[in-house]
Amino acid sequence: MLTVIPIPAFQDNYIWLLRQDASDKVVIVDPGDAQPVIEYLEREGLSLAAILVTHHHHDHTGGIDALVKRYSPRVIGPDNSAIPAIDEVVGDEDECRVQGRRFEVFAVPGHTLDHIAFYAPGTPGLLFCGDTLFSGGCGRLFEGTAEQMHRSLARLAALPDDTLVFAGHEYTLANLRFAQAAEPDNPARDAHLGECERARQLERPTLPSTIGRERQINPFLRIDQPGLLNALAEQGSVDDDSAAFATLRGWKDRF
């Protein structure tokens, strides 16, 4: 059985740690900071076998050099010279095997042009999506276009409903409060917001989410919903799905 453990970093990042059964060799995803990873590994008597990287931003890669020097893990990620110590470059429709699980790689440009996601099929599947899909939201468009991000999210939304979503940040409460403004009449979203508020009061993560849940609560996966489109029409163009998505993303940036 593969266990996924969140290691908090910075103000709101999650570094995900993957451990197969009782193995002392683990995998981590997007180590922006080495220190909390080292502390966890040393405390638990674990060694680092591999690092998965979703994109080049420093808060997802800043710890790689120190971890490579200490543990010599295999580093797997997209083709970008800004990412240190890559051993295995992967891109769209590639596969890699770590911790006994097969991971499919999806190109998901939008937040950055090099952004990829790692998906392990199964019951449930596991999706490590970095800053592309958040619970209740999506990443800002630093390099890509709204059309690219819309396509990337549609690809992730097509995964099975029970797929567990491991995003890179704890942004859920802020995202869901924006979602209330964008789509006021959504009881499923409101119920989930209450659950997430209680979780955060107890200092518990709101992640993982699931694809099925995100399809119910996340406005960026609900562009075709009439209530959302009515609200978006007051903010900008809704001439087609890409235009509506761009309007929604711009509104969130200003919110």
UniProtKB/Swiss-Prot annotation:
Its EC number is 3.1.2.6. The keyword Aminoacyl-tRNA synthetase does not apply. This is Hydroxyacylglutathione hydrolase. GO terms for biological process: methylglyoxal catabolic process to D-lactate via S-lactoyl-glutathione. InterPro entries: Clx_II_MBL, Glyoxalase_II_hydrolase, HAGH_C, Hydroxyacylglutathione_Hdrlase, Metallo-B-lactamas, RibonucZ/Hydroxyglut_hydro. Zn(2+) 2 binds at D59, H60, D131, H169. CDD domains: hydroxyacylglutathione_hydrolase_MBL-fold. It holds the Pfam family HAGH_C. Binds 2 Zn(2+) ions per subunit. It catalyses: an S-(2-hydroxyacyl)glutathione + H2O = a 2-hydroxy carboxylate + glutathione + H(+). The keyword Metal-binding applies. HAMAP family: Glyoxalase_2.
